[in-house]
């Protein structure tokens, strides 16, 4: 394939969380507003951008592999940019490791991206956009290029002040800073006017949101977004148990547009390990929050979580406490990971007493344990009729892919005479269940 000679073309690859993917939508919008055109491969691009994740070492190494893989393209005049958490964490050291990189920019500097693009175009080298964690500014732009015409993100809070012992996010994303409720609601209305019906509010700790004017709590903001005409579903992620309050559950229970799904990372079922992690809650306090969600009057909430296994000092007994917590809560999904040492974090000072092989063993046990819980949970949906939003067609299986308000995938068949529209809502009868998805048939 011929290499594009147009320097104002770009390719972007995104690693990591929803925050990164939404940041990339804003970066893409800014690039397009500056006259750039997006292309599908590195080979066709004049500017190659990697929006990076550093939450675990494996994610961090992916970007350096990409930079090495395509290094020879610099000889053809292509420019490289490293964005996001690895950029903020490693800073100018990236230039030493990958001298062909022209721009290193953390997420807090994206508001200056247009100016940095001018520097790239003028031939400048080693351009940096690195803010300290004390910045009060958030990245708001009218140039968001949303990748989905029906489901979209709104970042309501950036940064993190929790400083968990294992986590690099406070050092790469800066301190917590919230957008005004007025700004969030304005963006939500614009999305509704543009045809979006499913809106997800984002933050590293989304429920730590504090309206700078003091007008709205997080629960009140959720409700206000859900009351906007045209919006059918409101989601939010990720929550921190420390700031998870009962009024959030009450809002979900009483407002059908607020999705009946909460992702509440626990990280460990052992109070001792949680204390070493600096999570600032106990097993019992976490389970109190679960009890609020189990006690709803109008809706049954789906609960998912994150778990780290093999944290320094975690004993077999403490690991078994985590397995017991899974049994107690009956999560609909668990994102589980082996502990990975990260730069600048307090846990680096701990003696990593759990061998890598043992971490892998525990992870496998936990995943298999949770898989059986999910298998039983998903089977309970058989015979139910559930509303889905149509996301895509799976032509090879003669099925359509839908998503429920509980964020579950429901693959379904339709009569030959029916052609659902992407983004439309339909009633589906569940006929089969698997540990990670449901299967059904269109009934309305």
Curated annotation (Swiss-Prot):
An example molecular function term from Gene Ontology annotations: metal ion binding
Class of this enzyme: transferase
Transmembrane segments: none
Sequence positions that bind [4Fe-4S] cluster 1: 17, 53, 85
TRAM domain ranges (all copies): 379-444
Residue ranges of domain MTTase N-terminal in the record: 8-122
Swiss-Prot/TrEMBL keywords: 4Fe-4S, Cytoplasm, Iron, Iron-sulfur, Metal-binding, S-adenosyl-L-methionine, Transferase, tRNA processing
Pfam families from the UniProt entry: Radical_SAM (PF04055), TRAM (PF01938), UPF0004 (PF00919)
Recorded catalytic activity of this chain's protein: N(6)-dimethylallyladenosine(37) in tRNA + (sulfur carrier)-SH + AH2 + 2 S-adenosyl-L-methionine = 2-methylsulfanyl-N(6)-dimethylallyladenosine(37) in tRNA + (sulfur carrier)-H + 5'-deoxyadenosine + L-methionine + A + S-adenosyl-L-homocysteine + 2 H(+)
Protein's cellular compartments: Cytoplasm
Binding locations of [4Fe-4S] cluster 2: 160, 164, 167
UniProt subunit comment: Monomer.
Annotated protein name in UniProt: tRNA-2-methylthio-N(6)-dimethylallyladenosine synthase
Organism expressing this protein natively: Koribacter versatilis (strain Ellin345)
